[in-house]
Amino acid sequence: MVGENKFDRHLNRNWETGVVSYPEPAVEIIEESFRKYVIGNAGMERIYTGCRWAEGPAWFGDGRYLLWSDIPNNRILRWTEETGSVSEFRKPSNNANGNVRDREGRLISCEHLTRRVTRTEHDGTVNVIADSFRNFPLNS
């Protein structure tokens, strides 16, 4: 079973065929100060496993999809709400980590590997917005 662990065996879950809804019993609050951020009536789903670590989610409401970075695997992934499928949006991503949309709906990303901030245009081309500050390269 993909991603099997002690919680999967205990709860008889199979991540290949289903999604677990909140409250997710396998989510453990390690730092008690975080508990105040848990909203009892808010939904939470695990939509993907397989990232070494993930961050930088950016929601594209008009297209009903979510982009996020899988930094060590050097890719940006895309989850589509309609189908629930996950695909690669961009690889290599130059280890992009922070992502956000601009006012025109384009993706802005901070690239760790190239030490630059880029904008992905609607046609998929990538343009550099910034790669230095006061003649010094960005630091990450």
Regions found by a protein language model. Give the residues of each.
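Sequence-structural signature of mature extracellular/luminal beta-sheet repeat domains
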Residues: 1-140
